[in-house]
Amino acid sequence: RETEISSAGDFYVHDVAGYSIAVVRTERGDIHAYPNACLHRGRQLKSGSSAGLGKSRDITCPFHGFRWSLDGSFQGAPCEWDFPHIDRSNFDLPALRVDTWGGWVFVNIDGTAPPLHEYLGIMVDHFERWAPEKTYKALHIKKVLRCNWKIANEAFIESYHTAATHPQLLPYTGDSNSQYDCFNDYVSRTITPMGVVSPHVRGTTEEQAVHQWLTVYGVDAEEGLPELPAGKSAREFLGDMNIRRFSKMYDQDLSSFATHSEVLDAILYSVFPNFAPWAGFRPNVTYRFLPYNDSPDMCTMEIMLMMRYPESQARPRDATEQFVPADQTLGDTPGIEAGLAAEHERSEGQAPRHDMEHRHDREHAVG
């Protein structure tokens, strides 16, 4: 996040797929990114905390002391007289492409890639009303999973698996009512309605759906388990309730502009290849999936809880990254990995609507 490197000298080291990148905040307040390697002997220039974060006045190689300023300009080296072949005017750190959106910092090592906001397309306009740059990271969990990062990613961008994997959610989740959209070559969206009974469930009433939702989410216990007013659906009741809750939480009246979908539903955008922010006015999570070391059979999944806060209050500090064991949500991913390895050919058992996003991502992974 931009806020994690908010002051001059703050840096973040990002290691992925054999690349090491140093992202720094300069004295002028700009964000720069460089390959995290000394131009002399290739030694890593920066090593942050376990979460990759750190702070320094400049960029000095810990091996031989070659030194650059935060803006990447070469400042000198011990015994510089012994390096007459070094052209000071042409020995700056090579800059990588950096851009920001929604408070997130994006680095691209591909000089031919389109600009970030062009890449994100209509998603930029969609998120303008939700202002993710005005949120803080309340929780950051990172897990190592025994599956390829693409498999972990795919497991979280559709709701088709809910009936088999999370049947406890069906009394108040419209899993098969989900809407799937592919906006461009890189961005897709899933909207799964909440506060409705799944078509897979029989015999659950609207009032039972409300009670189950309130029980699971632990909402406003002092209100008890209310009776559903006559003529009002569970979705309407829960939507109105969340508008009141979040208006109080953010010290902002949402009733004049927020929809029930924006305070209730699971609205997930997936940005190829590995970034997936939830949307709306509720507390939202953002996912990031990355390869783990050099193994094609392991990955890391990051879950970041993004929270709003009243503008009248000081911005809370971002949470530090924590490692925790996998839970039920991820329990089936090793089986998927083994199953794919056993396949001789791609089966034809794909659901045209639910698997649309998966084909969308795969096509661009190989294309």
Regions found by a protein language model. Name each.
Residues 5-111, 115-126:
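Rieske [2Fe-2S] iron-sulfur-binding domain
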Residues 30, 99, 104, 108-367:
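C-terminal catalytic domain of Rieske-type non-heme iron oxygenases
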Residues 1-2:
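Extracytoplasmic c-type cytochrome modules immediately beyond a signal peptide or single-pass transmembrane anchor
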